[in-house]
């Protein structure tokens, strides 16, 4: 017996009311948007840019079954540098991605001294280096050249927050799109390379 339509619909209503709503992962995270953008650039033959893996040292592995090994304990082997690197039109690209819920600034404690040093080294080798900053509460995204990030960082050794006004003055706003989602190569081509490509 199906009990159409009343008992089925009332049962559904009761279960949906009794379950708490989970708002986790409602929107795509900024990093996932960058990964989707990089996949698009790769599929179109525009750039080859990948997320850098974080090196870990495995300490203990549990083998409940021979085919089901489980890492129980692991540590970071070394401090990571930046999130992404690759090649665009013959230029080496290296960048960090940061997202904040704050409305007026991004905390500089999110940038570590070894990351700043790495960015300085990339710039010394004529690489293209920058940070993509996403203010999730305003849905604003900026590309800030590493030079401007480093300059601000060295003012007080990364102790204070970088105001949004500074980012708007020295960075470039990126409007989200469909394909690619975060078209940062447009900013690189137009502003960092002056419209030239190899």
Curated annotation (Swiss-Prot):
Q: Where is this protein localized, as stated in its record?
A: Cytoplasm
* Annotated positions for site Transition state stabilizer: 98
Q: Primary place of residence?
A: cytoplasm
* Enzyme Commission numbers on file: 3.1.21.10
Catalytic reaction annotation: Endonucleolytic cleavage at a junction such as a reciprocal single-stranded crossover between two homologous DNA duplexes (Holliday junction)
Task: Please give the superkingdom of this protein's source.
Answer: Bacteria
Query: Any binding details for the cofactor?
Result: Binds 1 Mg(2+) ion per subunit.
Alphabetized InterPro entries for the sequence: Resolv_RecU, Restrct_endonuc-II-like, tRNA_endonuc-like_dom_sf
Question: What cofactor does its activity depend on?
Answer: Mg(2+)
Could you tell me which Gene3D superfamilies the record lists for this protein?
A: 3.40.1350.10
Q: Which GO terms describe its molecular function?
A: endonuclease activity; magnesium ion binding; nucleic acid binding
Q: Which UniProt keywords apply?
A: Cytoplasm, DNA damage, DNA recombination, DNA repair, Endonuclease, Hydrolase, Magnesium, Metal-binding, Nuclease
Which Gene Ontology BP terms does the record give?
A: chromosome segregation; DNA recombination; DNA repair
Question: Per the record, where are the segments of Polar residues compositional bias?
Answer: 11-22
Residues annotated to bind Mg(2+): 81, 83, 96, 115
Instruction: Tell me the segments the record calls region Disordered.
Output: 1-22
The record's GO CC annotations read:
cytoplasm
State the family it belongs to.
Answer: Belongs to the RecU family.
Which function does this protein serve?
A: Endonuclease that resolves Holliday junction intermediates in genetic recombination. Cleaves mobile four-strand junctions by introducing symmetrical nicks in paired strands. Promotes annealing of linear ssDNA with homologous dsDNA. Required for DNA repair, homologous recombination and chromosome segregation.
Q: Any idea what this protein is called? A: Holliday junction resolvase RecU
């Amino acid at each position: 017996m199906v009990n159409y339509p009343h008992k089925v619909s009332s049962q559904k209503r009761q279960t949906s009311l009794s379950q708490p709503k989970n708002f986790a992962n409602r929107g795509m995270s900024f990093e996932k948007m960058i990964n989707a953008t990089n996949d698009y650039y790769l599929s179109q033959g525009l750039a080859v840019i990948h997320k850098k893996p974080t090196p870990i040292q495995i300490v203990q592995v549990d083998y409940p079954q021979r085919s089901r090994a489980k890492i129980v304990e692991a540590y970071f082997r070394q401090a990571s540098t930046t999130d992404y690197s690759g090649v665009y039109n013959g230029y080496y690209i290296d960048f960090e991605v940061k997202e904040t819920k704050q409305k007026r600034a991004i905390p500089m404690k999110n940038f570590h001294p070894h990351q700043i040093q790495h960015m300085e080294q990339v710039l010394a080798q004529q690489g293209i280096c920058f940070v993509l900053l996403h203010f999730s509460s305003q849905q604003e995204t900026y590309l800030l050249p590493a030079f401007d990030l480093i300059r601000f960082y060295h003012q007080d050794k990364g102790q204070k927050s970088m105001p949004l006004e500074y980012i708007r003055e020295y960075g470039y706003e990126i409007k989200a799109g469909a394909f690619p989602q975060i078209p940062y190569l447009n900013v690189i081509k137009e502003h960092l390379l002056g419209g030239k490509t190899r």
